[in-house]
Amino acid sequence: MKKLIIAIATCMIFGMADAQDRRQMGGIYHAYPYASMADNLIDATPEGYTPFYLSHYGRHGSRWMTNDERYEWLYSYFVDRQNLTPLGRKVGKAMRKVLDNARGNGGRLSRLGAIQHEGIARRMYSRLPQIFAPGNRVKARASVVDRCVKSMQAFTAMMQSLQPALEMDIAADSANMAWIAYTAPEVKELEKSLNIVARTNPER
C-alpha cells in the first residue's frame, strides 16, 4: 500500500511539473513569473561600500497581442459551428469571450504587465533603500509607444508610493527615441548592403 501511495504521489509531482513545462513552451506568449529564488543571487553590498546609483534599462511589461486582428483571426476558426466537435464548440465559446475582452486593447499593456513593473520598483526599493532616500531623484524615460509609457508609469507610481519624498523626473519624448530604440551603424550598413530591413516579425 505504501509503495502504491508513493507511486501515485510521484506521478502527481511529475504531472504538475509537466504542466508547468508545457505552459513555459509558449515562448514569447508565456508571461514568465518572477522567481523568488533570484533573490539569493543578489550579493550583499561589500563592507566599506555604499550604493549611491542604480541604472535600469527594461522592456515593457506583458501586453495584449499586437493588434485586435490577431484575436479575430483566431476566433474565425471557430465561427462555423457545424464543422466543430463538442470540444471545439466549447473552445469557440471561450474564444468569443477572449475576443470581446481583448477588443480595443491590441498592443496595449496588460494589468499583468503593470504588476511586473510595480514589482521591479518594489524590489529595487527593498534591496537598496538608501538610494531612494527622501529628496533623491529618480529620472525615468520611456519610448513614446503607449505600452512603454504605461510600464514606466506603473514603475514610477509604485516607487513614489514607497517613498513620497522622492523627486520624480518623468518623460516620454520622441527626442529620446534615438537612444531608447537605438540602431547600431553596423546594422544600418547591413540593411543597405542586403537591401532588406532587419526587423521583428509584426505577427508575434
Feature-to-residue mapping (PLM):
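Sec-dependent N-terminal signal peptides
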Residues: 4-15
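Non-catalytic terminal regions with compositionally biased, polar/charged low complexity
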Residues: 20-204
